[in-house]
Curated annotation (Swiss-Prot):
Identification of the protein by name: Variable large protein 4
InterPro entries: Borrelia_lipo (IPR000680)
Annotated GO CC locations: cell outer membrane
Membrane protein topology class: Lipid-anchor
SUPFAM superfamilies: Variable surface antigen VlsE
Gene name for this UniProt entry: vlp4
Biological function: The Vlp and Vsp proteins are antigenically distinct proteins, only one vlp or vsp gene is transcriptionally active at any one time. Switching between these genes is a mechanism of host immune response evasion.
Subcellular location(s) of the protein: Cell outer membrane
N-terminal signal peptide: 1-18
Covalent lipidation (N-palmitoyl cysteine), chain numbering: C19
A Pfam cross-reference name: Lipoprotein_2
C-alpha cells in the first residue's frame, strides 16, 4: 500500500515539473496541481494507518475486548472522514477542474461515505468490557448476544461490504459434513454443558476454517435485520447468522434449519455472537474445552475483520488510482477551455 501511494505521489510531482519547465509563472492550474501533490503527501500519512488496522485485525485474540472491536470500527470511520475532508477541501479551492471534481465526488459518495456510515453503525454493536471469548473455566453455559447490538453489526457490516466487496464470497459455502449438527453445543444451557467439550468445539473450528472471510461476511449481511429468538427450541430454530448470535441458552444442541446448516453461516453466527454485547459461549468445566471455545471465537472474528479491512484498503487504493488518472487527463487536455484560459475557467467556476 505504501509503495502504491508513493508511486501516485511521484507521478503528481512529475506533472508539476512538466508544468513549470517552461519558466511560466504560476497559474491556477499549477497551483491546483501543487495542492493535489501536497494532498498526496498527506495521503501517505493517512493511509499508512491502514497498516495498523490490518495488524489489529490479524491480532485478534481470545482476550480482545468487545469494546476493542467497537474502537476498531470507530477508527475506520474517523479515517474515512479525515480523507473525505482533505479531498473536499482541495476540490472546494480548485473547483474549475470539473473532471477531477466529478471523480473525487463519486469516490466520496460511493466509497468513503458508505464505509464511514457502516463503521459507525457497526461500532454500536460492539460494546462492553467483556472479552470476545467470554468462556472461562468458571463459565459453563452460553448467553445470547444483545439483539440490538447484533442488528447494528449486521447493518453496519452490510453497508461496508456493499461498498468494498460487492458479491464476493458465498453465504452458502459449506464443506464439512454431518459434524455440524453438534456445533449447537456451544449455545447450550447449564443442563447440557457437558456436551460443550473440546471434541464438539473442534467441529465449530472446522467450519470456521473451511470458509473464507468473504464467505463469512456474505453470511452476515444476508442475515435478517430483525432476527427471531426461539426461547423454547433455541439453536434448532435458528435460520441465519444473526439468529445463531442471539439464540437463547436452552437444552437444545442440533442445528436443524437447512439455511443455518452452512459452514459460512455457522462461522458468521459465532463471529457475531463473539463481537456483540453480552454474547457468550458454553464450555464443559475443564480448561481444554474453554480454550477450544476461546480459540474458535477469536478465529471467527479475526478472519472476518481481516478480510474486511483488506477489502477497504484495496477499494480506497483503487479510488486513489482513479483520481490520479483524472489528474493525468487534465494534463493531457491543456488545450481544453479550462486549461488554455485558466483565468476564465476559474471565474466561471466561482
Amino acid at each position: 500500500m505504501r509503495r502504491r501511494i508513493s508511486a501516485i505521489i511521484m507521478t503528481l510531482f512529475m506533472v508539476l515539473v512538466s508544468c513549470n519547465s517552461g519558466g511560466v509563472a504560476e497559474d491556477p492550474k499549477t497551483v491546483y496541481l501543487t495542492s493535489i501533490a501536497n494532498l498526496g503527501k498527506g495521503f501517505l500519512d493517512v493511509f499508512v494507518t491502514f497498516g495498523d488496522m490490518v495488524a489489529g485485525a490479524f491480532g485478534i485474540r481470545a482476550d480482545t475486548k468487545k469494546s476493542d472491536i467497537g474502537k476498531y470500527f470507530n477508527d475506520i470511520e474517523k479515517t474515512m472522514t479525515t480523507v473525505k475532508k482533505r479531498l473536499q477541501d482541495e476540490v472546494a479551492k480548485n473547483g474549475n477542474y470539473v473532471k477531477v471534481k466529478e471523480v473525487v465526488d463519486k469516490f466520496v459518495a460511493d466509497v468513503l461515505d458508505k464505509i464511514a456510515a457502516g463503521a459507525k453503525e457497526a461500532a454500536k454493536g460492539a460494546t462492553g468490557d467483556d472479552k470476545i471469548r467470554k468462556c472461562y473455566f468458571c463459565w459453563a453455559w452460553s448467553q445470547s448476544a444483545d439483539k440490538d447490538s447484533v442488528i447494528s453489526l449486521v447493518k453496519g457490516i452490510k453497508t461496508i461490504v456493499d461498498a468494498v466487496l460487492k458479491d464476493k464470497g458465498d453465504a452458502g459455502a459449506t464443506k464439512t459434513g454431518e459434524d455440524k449438527k453438534d456445533i449447537g453445543n456451544l449455545f447450550i444451557n447449564d443442563a447440557g454443558k457437558d456436551g460443550s467439550k473440546r471434541e464438539n468445539i473442534a467441529k465449530a473450528a472446522a467450519s470456521i476454517g473451511s470458509v473464507t472471510g468473504a464467505d463469512i461476511l456474505q453470511a452476515i449481511i444476508k442475515s435478517k435485520e430483525n432476527p427471531n429468538a426461539d426461547s423454547v427450541n433455541g439453536i434448532e430454530k435458528a435460520t441465519d447468522a444473526a439468529e445463531i448470535a442471539i439464540v437463547p441458552a436452552v437444552n437444545k444442541t442440533e442445528i436443524k434449519e437447512d439455511t443455518a446448516k452452512k459452514d459460512a453461516v455457522i462461522a458468521a453466527g459465532i463471529a457475531l455472537r463473539a463481537m456483540a454485547k453480552d454474547g457468550k459461549f458454553a464450555a464443559k468445566n475443564e480448561e481444554k474445552s474453554a480454550n477450544a471455545v476461546n480459540g474458535a471465537a477469536a478465529s471467527a472474528v479475526g478472519k472476518t475483520l481481516s478480510t474486511l479491512i483488506i477489502a477497504i484498503r484495496n477499494t480506497v487504493d483503487s479510488g486513489l488510482k482513479t483520481i490520479n488518472e483524472a489528474l493525468a487527463t487534465v494534463k493531457q487536455e491543456d488545450k481544453s477551455a479550462e486549461a488554455t484560459n485558466p483565468a476564465e475557467a476559474t471565474t466561471s467556476g466561482q
